[in-house]
Amino acid sequence: LLNFFGQWNSLAKCHAVNMNSGSFFRLHRDAYKTNQQMRIFIPLNKTELHEWAFIYDKDIAPFKAGTPYLLNTKKQHGSFAFVNDIYHVLMGIYINPHNFRVVTDLLPNCEDYE
């Protein structure tokens, strides 16, 4: 994970979240009032549906632990914990040429259009 975090040059925020059974993030949309941002979400453990559920744009979204996901959090999203000791990383990354290049390099099927 350290190599992953070191790639970005402008973080808006980055924090780890711990969820326990019964905790949740209500359905909401993120608003970017000043600077445009990308949201990267990294579930670290317990991503099976009987452990934790993530609702994204009215659907239950499947996630793989340890995999970073780029999310459009202007779409409605939220999550619900059914077991204890769930850990995730949430990152807000400012959109700039460097960070955009990092994203395109990380995406397996992204083509470069200049």
Region spans (language model):
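A short secondary-structure junction signal
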Residues: 26-30, 50-57, 81, 101-102
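Active-site or metal-binding loop neighborhoods of secreted/extracellular toxin and effector enzymes
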Residues: 99-113
